[in-house]
Amino acid sequence: MKAEFKRKGGGKVKLVVGMTGATGAIFGVRLLQWLKAAGVETHLVVSPWANVTIKHETGYTLQEVEQLATYTYSHKDQAAAISSGSFDTDGMIVAPCSMKSLASIRTGMADNLLTRAADVMLKERKKLVLLTRETPLNQIHLENMLALTKMGTIILPPMPAFYNRPRSLEEMVDHIVFRTLDQFGIRLPEAKRWNGIEKQKGGA
């Protein structure tokens, strides 16, 4: 897939990508891989625990993940470009998003670059998508999600889908990534779309 996605007025689509320490690091990795293939400019910030999770759950190093992004930033760099509302971006995705980061974003703590960038999305009314990872959920988690939803945030838990009859773990992960990119109008031809149960059976 080599097609580049452009803004309506021209120019590359620009997205901020955050990765936290929640389980599911592969969602962030595959997201970056697909965004790179789509020609999207990405600005990546990785939390310290995300670095640990990447090493534990995937076969990638932090350096390899950072190389998938167009630009990378330290989580400590509160003076980075993405910390300002004047930075030109089309939105932000946090994949995966821990409950700690969810709470920080909801309360506007902005205690690191990742949560500050998310806070910027909220104040600038730009699209913010959180792939929240936790189960079961307690009342605090649910109230944080509800509050952010009321602020315009898209809560997109990376739940596996089986109606498209995935044949591998990678297909299940990619389905979530494609649904995430749909939120920004990035509709990849590789994404399987539901066309009704009979057609789905026939195409299996």
From Swiss-Prot:
Protein name: Probable UbiX-like flavin prenyltransferase
Expression triggers: Up-regulated by salicylate via the transcriptional regulator BsdA.
A GO biological process held by the record: response to toxic substance
Catalytic activity, EC: 2.5.1.129
Pfam families: Flavoprotein
Subunit-structure text: Homododecamer.
Further comment found in the protein's record: It is not known, if phenolic acid decarboxylase forms a complex composed of BsdB, BsdC and BsdD. The term subunit is often used in reference to the operon, however there is no experimental evidence to prove the existence of the complex.
Top-rank EC class of the record's enzyme: transferase
Xref: HAMAP family: ubiX_pad, ubiX_pad_yclB
Binding-site residues, FMN: 21-23, 47, 98-101, 133
